[in-house]
Amino acid sequence: VNPVLEAHGLVKRYGHVTALNGVDFELLPGEILAVIGDNGAGKSSLIKALSGALIPDEGQILLDGKPVHFHNPADARRAGIETVYQDLAVAPALDIAANLFLGREVRRKGVLGTVFRLLDTKRMEAESSAHMQDLKIGINAMSQSVETLSGGQRQGVAVARGAAFARHVVIMDEPTAALGVKESGMVLDLIREVRERGLPVILISHDIPTVFDVADRVHIQRLGRRVAVVRPGDVDMAEAVAIMAGAAPGKFTGSE
């Protein structure tokens, strides 16, 4: 199976600190791939490189087998890679539909849209409602403001936005970080729904039980390198943590 998104030999230095030290990466079609590692392992730098927020000093990124060069997140979005950030990046004062189309607003047809710049709110609300139903997110009124939603529902809006516009990959950065058990479960169900729609997901998480619950494969970072790719069925959580900490050797049971 050919990877949807891959990287070879990524290097990123910040002065004397090497954040990425020749990292390889493969995301396969239709999978949830978790990326784990201690602080300083290079998780954030890797994800920033894949999402266009950081330009690596060396190495290559390929999308569907073709080399890509992202200079900013907009380049990655245009290529079909959407990122749902840890800080949610939703606008609390705006309604759900406006949040889903943030930066991609649909204008009314004709003079009303081109001259007066009026938004086609009905179309945006209808499409938002369809996206939310697709992902089985139980919010009915697209006109309610995001600040009235629970943490899990807000995360749902952010995930729906990513899934609505991604053509190739959805990257989720700590999507359950600030949520309780019930809301975390809801977001994990959402992540599975995104995969069911055929979009592969990259999941960055510190929460190892969550990773083992939802991921098909786990990419383990340590000291700026990829030291393992494992399937949750092949190793237990304790071994994954030991590999992450350098107390156990790396292994690649999940690379086929």
Question: Where would I find each of the regions flagged by the language model?
Answer:
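Glycine-rich phosphate-binding loops of nucleotide-dependent enzymes
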Residues: 1-256
